[in-house]
Amino acid sequence: DNYWCPQSGEAFECFESDPNAKFCLNSGKTSVVICSKCRKKYEFCRNGLKVSKRPDYDCGAGWESTPCTGDNSAVPAVF
């Protein structure tokens, strides 16, 4: 995926089409499980995280069962 990212202080715009989708994201140094396509875009823009090509290795076996919470799915209104 590749996204247009807003500048700091600009509105973070994203139409959420799948709030329950789960993704294992990785930057080479960090791995995290997040929920929602908008959170995936946010993590790409803010932290350079991309969808892992080896999710079971990067996020651990059973990563798909990670519960969706505000901590791993919420996005700010302003970037």
UniProtKB/Swiss-Prot annotation:
One of its GO terms (cellular component) is extracellular region. Keywords: Disulfide bond, Secreted. Induction: Its release and/or synthesis is stimulated during parasitic infection. Signal peptide: none annotated. The keyword Membrane does not apply. Contains four disulfide bonds. The keyword Secreted applies. It is found in: Secreted. Its main location: secreted. Growth-controlling neurosecretory light green cells, in the cerebral ganglia of the CNS. Anti-gonadotropic neuropeptide. It also decreases the binding capacity of calfluxin to membrane-bound receptors of the albumen gland. This leads to inhibition of the reproductive activities of the infected snail. This is Schistosomin.
